[in-house]
Amino acid sequence: MGSFPSTLTNVPSYWPKAEFSLFVLGQILSISCYFFVAYHIIFEKSARKALHNHVIIILLFYNFLGVTFDLSLTLDRDRVGYVSLFSPTLCRFWQLVDNGIWYGGISLMMWASFERHILVFHSNFVRTTRQLVLVHYIPLIFFSLYAPLLYFYLIFLYPCDEDFDSTSLLCGGMCFYATIPNWFLVYDSFVDYTIPILLIVVFSISLLLRFIRQKQRLQQAVTWRQCRKMTIQLTLVSTTYLIFDLPYVIIFLVQSCGYPNFASNIIQPYVASLTYVPAIVLPYATLLALPRLKQKLCRLFFWKRHQRQIVPLTTYT
């Protein structure tokens, strides 16, 4: 993920402090929204059992780790110039969340974009228990754990000489980069990040177009409302990734095609730090797709007071 540089000459003097303040404010507000959304998805039986919410629950958990753990350490390091709670164990877990959990969230979003086609237009594929296991649960588990387990091995188990730096973001680079074959670095850049982001674009846009095209074919009102909710939810959530991750992918692809200096003056101070934004925005995108949102917000901010009859004390003589 990105960083908050303050020494680059092409950055206005006010920008690092402004960016820092915006991220702190966004983090505080986002955490509150995470709790609100998680409560209404996890503790409402109908929402918790809905297949399309399973991937959303894991996405919320992964991105919550990014907002509370990864972003907090990044902001603290940027504020004081070093990692306050520096220790090798902390550094390893920081690297795991920043890479394994982050890539895991992107893989999950890619699967969610594809699975939503099945849930909206081919719901007969997930009617039996066997179909649920093969089509829903196995892919969900795979895309949830693939990147976190891969980076757990690379960070905690891969044999290399660790040299943590308390003044650097993520305590310095991960040591496996120095010895791992170059093909893996190419694989990691494309398979774990670039291709999933591009597939999110394809699957999300095609879902929206299919929904608009087949809108008239959906005869039952119940089916129509359910399909609309699932499409809106996926569109809102995927948009948070596309707006803030797609620019980074486009710049990476152009640089990989023989233009290494393309946008190099903006990618580090501006574009790289945008990769933190989806984790901040995700709960709001999920919130907008919650059923009966207006009623939930009204209960939160304007709950009714129960009328109580007050009987005055009367003294009898």
Task: Give the label of every model feature segment.
Residues 54-61, 209-248:
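Intracellular effector-coupling site of seven-transmembrane GPCRs
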Residues 102-138, 290:
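Class A GPCR helix-loop hinge within the 7TM core
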Residues 1-11, 81-100, 128, 133, ...:
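Loop architecture of class A 7-transmembrane GPCRs
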Residues 1-36:
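Extracellular N-terminal segment of 7TM GPCRs
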